[in-house]
Amino acid sequence: SANVVAAAVAKKAENDENMTFGKCEVVFTDLMNKKAEELGATNSHFANAHGYHSDDHYTCAHDLALIGRAFMENKTLAEIAKEKSYSGNGAEGLVKAEDTSVKTQDYNWRSHNLLITDGEYNYPYAIGIKTGFTDEAGDCVTAAAEKDGEELIAVIFKSEDPNRWLDAKNLFEYG
């Protein structure tokens, strides 16, 4: 959920390398809402780039499935989403060194999507997407799986671990 990437996208979209981080979030959020509308996600409105709770920030499972499908249609994003881990500076090349509105650092990152990692909840057909948690939304996951050339998206809200992994597996098996 790297806000530094949202800032880089906003700066590129507006062709404004001097944009403040606060303005970046407004621009990126506007872009999110426009893209959601283009995808037919009519029961969603985004109020921030990070996903934390706001009364004006909401979605539904159908809309997240539409967004997840579009995400996975982007081959670069799909490759990133199925990675179990990453080490390096995730913002390298995205922001200029003199841009003091964005702080970067090296990361050792591991996926929180237990469907793609090598543990107890691994699902061999899982190919990504994104986990989340807030007190209001509980444990969530938008997950993708592919088997026999068919790709499915499962969206789980208001769950608790380990149920979100088991529910996603069950939805994939049902589908």
Positions of PLM-derived features:
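Domain-terminus/edge residues, biased toward the C-terminal soluble/receptor-binding domains
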Residues: 41-42, 53-175
